[in-house]
């Protein structure tokens, strides 16, 4: 207990490892020791500076691991963690705080590994897309996915911090999806000049820059719709055209909007599934009673080893802890 005193007591590995701030040193086979971890480690393994836990109330309370398969790391401050490229502070367990690595393609994130604040500018998905203006986090998307999303455009003005931005109120993106123009026509989806429509939400071509009035019938994204649907109502679909997935308005609903796969999965609260029998796709909640996982908040489809079909794997639960297998 006193480093300057060569004497001590003999203990088992269990007793040593169960003592706060101590670890077993087997480096000398016939002179094994139960040694004290170096501060600010409150637990360590192998050597005194290989921390497995840090002082949650100290100046460096976050355990930062550089190798996912190695349970040891170093203790760092919040400033040092957040200043490291691709890392974020995780305070979800108050007495076991961690400095964790962001999920690719995030190059910076906050809160959780998949809440990006910056994307790899040279990667396949370099644009940060936010769905809530007051939330600085979002997902990383490609130029194609951004420009294909209704109301969004790609902003390359900052080369190392590209964004997929939503057009301001009263504006619509151009057909290229690279900038926005004023557009007062409610039935217009794309404007290449101020108040000159280039593509109508009704599916009909514009005449002299204006869209024809909506009529009874299905929106251009629908393959089927409700009886009372109008051609400018994208949320009345009962089936979707190829490449789109029906997202029901409610869990029991039979109608909704037809989204692309990226639009469906962008915030990770939904996943895509082919509807058996007619090859029509569905955009389902992670907690869907039939095909999802009860209590799951965020998920993704993954093909697990030995399985031919993709499986829903949960990454965040609503009110429960996540199991290693990804089942809530």
UniProtKB/Swiss-Prot annotation:
Gene3D superfamilies tied to this protein: Hormone Receptor, Insulin-like Growth Factor Receptor 1, Chain A, domain 2
Keyword Transferase: no
Coiled coil feature spans: none
Residue stretches of each Sequence repeat: 38-102, 103-167
Superkingdom of origin: Eukaryota
Any further remark recorded for this protein: Cysteine-rich, antigenically variant surface protein.
Official protein name in the record: Surface antigen CRP170
Protein's organism: Giardia intestinalis
């Amino acid at each position: 207990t006193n480093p300057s005193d060569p004497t001590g007591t003999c203990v088992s590995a269990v007793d040593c490892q169960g003592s706060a701030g101590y670890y077993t040193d087997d480096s000398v086979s016939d002179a094994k020791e139960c040694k004290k971890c170096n501060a600010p480690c409150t637990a360590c393994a192998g050597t005194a500076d290989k921390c497995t836990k840090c002082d949650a109330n100290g100046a460096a309370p976050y355990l930062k691991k550089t190798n996912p398969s190695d349970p040891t790391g170093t203790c760092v401050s919040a400033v040092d963690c957040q200043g490291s490229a691709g890392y974020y502070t995780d305070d979800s367990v108050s007495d076991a705080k961690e400095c964790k690595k962001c999920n690719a393609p995030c190059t910076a994130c906050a809160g959780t590994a998949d809440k990006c604040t910056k994307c790899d500018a040279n990667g396949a998905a370099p644009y940060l897309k936010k769905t809530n203006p007051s939330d600085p986090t979002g997902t990383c998307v490609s130029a194609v996915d951004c420009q294909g999303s209704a109301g969004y455009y790609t902003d390359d003005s900052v080369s190392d911090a590209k964004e997929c931005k939503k057009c301001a109120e009263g504006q619509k993106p151009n057909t290229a999806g690279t900038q926005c123009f004023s557009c007062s026509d409610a039935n217009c989806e794309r404007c290449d000049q101020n108040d000159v429509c280039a593509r109508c939400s009704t599916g009909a071509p514009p005449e002299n820059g204006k869209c024809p009035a909506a009529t009874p019938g299905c929106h251009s994204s629908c393959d089927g719709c409700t009886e009372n649907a109008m051609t400018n109502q994208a949320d009345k679909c009962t089936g979707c055209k190829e490449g789109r997935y029906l997202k029901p308005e409610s869990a029991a609903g039979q109608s909704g909007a037809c989204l692309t796969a990226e639009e469906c999965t962008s915030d990770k609260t939904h996943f895509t599934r082919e509807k058996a029998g007619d090859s029509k796709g569905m955009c389902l909640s992670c907690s869907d009673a039939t095909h999802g996982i009860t209590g799951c908040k965020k998920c993704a489809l993954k093909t697990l080893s030995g399985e031919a079909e993709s499986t829903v794997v949960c990454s965040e639960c609503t009110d429960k802890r996540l199991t290693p297998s990804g089942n809530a």
